[in-house]
Design a protein with these regions (language model features):
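Hydrophobic/aromatic residues located in beta-strands of well-ordered beta-sheets
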Residues: 149, 210-212
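Conserved N-terminal segment of class I S-adenosyl-L-methionine
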Residues: 1-184, 193-199, 259-265, 271-275, ...
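Helix-to-beta-strand junctions that scaffold the AdoMet/dcAdoMet cofactor pocket
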Residues: 190-191, 204-206
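Short catalytic micro-motifs in class I SAM-dependent methyltransferases
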Residues: 184-191, 236
Length: 297
């Protein structure tokens, strides 16, 4: 059987430094990683293609950003997102990792973002690009609030399932600027996140809003537990951001972090009180990898 092919990222994905420090490494077909891969739902299993192949997780000695140095080549990443992550595999993963409650809370989560964008941006109609939009759930909520919203997603299975306007590539966009661009749990999947964000910056109106959200990989340096695997899956989550490194990543590309306005998607006084408490105590609470930025300059 043909083995999957990898390329090496030998400079930092955030600052470009070549000072990379090894955190952990191993073979795909050995240890806990092999067992975790075998448990996951797949269309066509990637495990036979990964026999003897090496993974290597590193950290930048200059800016502390951590990432997998060995990533699939473009050809094999296309296989990853079409054959391995098939529509059936995605549906099974979502079924076993959630259910109706997960969908409900995700809708609430997205609605809060919509209300916050409406508060931050005066322009109407408000134009939003959701990059890596998946099934288009956030876009659907944007449309309900009267936004002009389109998405981009490279997964054929997810594009086919979406009931809204989703393109395979940003090259298909019409060139009109967007007031806001969102990347919900996308940066961790990208071979070249800096290059992608530079490209997206060109589609954002002056003073436009950028929302970034990734898993928080604070303290994760190796793959020993399911939590580790979920954070830095070497086929899917190839970049491991923390609140500090995510902020630094965006700031290097010309974005300034801003506070999120308060929004309440509830009639519960208790939940409103908790939201207000988080707003007031925000600087004292733990940092998060859900961050808002404004394009400067």
């Amino acid at each position: 059987m043909t083995r999957a092919q990898f390329k090496t990222r030998d400079t930092c994905i955030s600052c470009g430094s070549g000072d990379l420090q090894r955190l952990s490494d191993g073979r795909f077909d050995q240890g806990p990683l092999r067992e975790f891969l075998l448990r996951d739902p797949w269309g066509e299993s990637p495990v036979p293609y990964l026999a003897g192949q090496l993974w290597r997780y590193v950290k930048c000695g200059t800016c502390d950003t951590a990432f997998h140095a060995n990533v699939l080549t473009p050809e094999w990443n296309d296989i990853n997102f079409s054959r391995w992550m098939s529509a059936e595999a995605i549906a099974e993963f979502e079924r076993t990792h959630g259910g109706p409650d997960r969908l409900f809370y995700r809708a609430m989560h997205y609605t809060k973002h919509v209300l916050q964008l409406a508060s931050l941006i005066e322009a109407r109609p408000l134009r939003v690009l959701d990059f890596g939009c998946g099934n288009g759930e956030f876009l659907a909520i944007c449309h309900q609030f009267g936004f002009e919203a389109v998405g981009v997603d490279r997964s054929t299975a997810r594009r086919d399932k979406a009931g809204v306007n989703v393109f395979a590539s940003a090259d298909e966009l019409d060139g009109r600027p967007f007031n806001a661009i969102t990347l919900f749990e996308v940066l961790e999947h990208l071979d070249d996140p800096s290059g992608i964000l530079k490209m997206l910056r060109g589609h954002l109106a002056p003073g436009g809003i950028l929302i970034l959200e990734t898993p928080d990989c604070s303290g994760v340096e190796r793959i020993e537990t399911m939590h580790d695997y979920g954070c830095i899956h070497p086929l899917q989550h190839i970049n491991g951001f923390t609140p500090e490194t995510l902020r630094g990543f965006a700031e290097r590309l010309g974005f300034e972090e801003i506070g999120k306005p308060v929004s309440h998607v509830t009639t519960s006084p208790v939940k409103v009180a908790k939201t207000e408490a988080r707003r007031v105590l925000g600087p004292l609470l733990s940092l998060t990898t859900q961050q808002y930025f404004r394009l400067t300059g």
